């Protein structure tokens, strides 16, 4: 898939701008705080209906404006289609091919993106929350079912935590409601856990040879999903559901005492091993960065396998964070097959054939100077 054109109105520091996009590489050059990252963020937000930088949509609206609008014209193998997002202080509306979508699960997935920013280098050494968010955002793009299950799980989790807190504070004494919530909780917790395990297994299959290639076969990479729900090797989902139910029942007193749900996908983690050693604890900065790069490149391939189209790659000031060999591997991998948007303060130091055919835009105070 390709983004042919991007139009912004009242988005961050952009009053009104139209970007005619190159089908291969688009380089956004400018000093810091001029709007380069805002432009990449708008593409990400158009794809996933949420920003990677803030959970408050009001921050996306230009100062003193009533609304923000993002519109993109996409081209696929089978044709073209516009996506539109309106953001107001009351919420947001999304349209696919001019038709309003009343559920975000019907919207997300029409535009697939992979974002690689400096903070993504923290996927290995960052908190479990960072890794869970990574899984949810990537898996949600390729599976509307997962996105719906996750939404249901988060709703039930919130209800369960509220009720646990009331039981802890002795505001409630009847545990029947908690048992009902646990039945629903177990259903969606199991669905999400199984889908995540499958996703990580697929990602590992693609990431291992990429990592080996980047390191000239000096390193091996293994991914390990670490669920808080310790399940057996059983493959029958009905029996696995019973296991989850029993675990929740056995730990009901403990959860009431703590006033919070202690088990479930919201407590899970993802581990990385380089040469069979935990990369988070023992990996060098170089190994951690290579791992992050391998994962991102594997994402690109996985989306192509699942969707049948390569995603759009957003590189937010990350090339300067990679050494020459990693930079070369990244650019060589995406060349001629992945539409890419790159932000940078300078093209000096980016020495690759791909740059000869790139389209350059200068960004200055919310305006694009070609």
Curated annotation (Swiss-Prot):
Gene Ontology biological process: DNA replication; DNA synthesis involved in DNA repair; double-strand break repair; SOS response
UniProt key word RNA-binding: no
Binding site for ATP: 30-37
Assigned GO CC terms: cytoplasm
GO molecular function, one term: single-stranded DNA binding
Pfam families registered for this protein in UniProt: SMC_N
Keyword annotations from UniProtKB, A to Z: ATP-binding, Cytoplasm, DNA damage, DNA repair, DNA replication, DNA-binding, Nucleotide-binding, SOS response
Principal location class: cytoplasm
Protein's cellular compartments: Cytoplasm
Matching SUPFAM superfamilies: P-loop containing nucleoside triphosphate hydrolases
CDD domains with a match to the protein in the record: ABC_RecF
Family label: Belongs to the RecF family.
Xref: PANTHER family: DNA REPLICATION AND REPAIR PROTEIN RECF (PTHR32182:SF0)
Function noted in UniProt: The RecF protein is involved in DNA metabolism; it is required for DNA replication and normal SOS inducibility. RecF binds preferentially to single-stranded, linear DNA. It also seems to bind ATP.
Name the record gives this protein: DNA replication and repair protein RecF
Species in which this protein is naturally found: Staphylococcus carnosus (strain TM300)
